[in-house]
Amino acid sequence: KFVEITVDGEKCIINASAVQLVKPTDEGTLILFQNGAKIHTEFSFQELSNILLN
C-alpha cells in the first residue's frame, strides 16, 4: 500500500508496507523504514497512524 504524506512541505509517496516503526517526536513523527531510512514529518503520531492504517 502506498500513501501520500507531506515532508518538508513536499508531497511524498511512501510504501506503508516498508514502515518498520512510527515514533512520536516533539516536532511531529519519525518514520523508520525496514531498510534503515528515516523520514521526519510534521504529522502528529495519531494523524500518521490513521493514514498508514486506513
Predicted regions and their residues:
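Acidic, Ser/Thr- and proline-rich intrinsically disordered linker/docking segments
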Residues: 1-13, 17-54
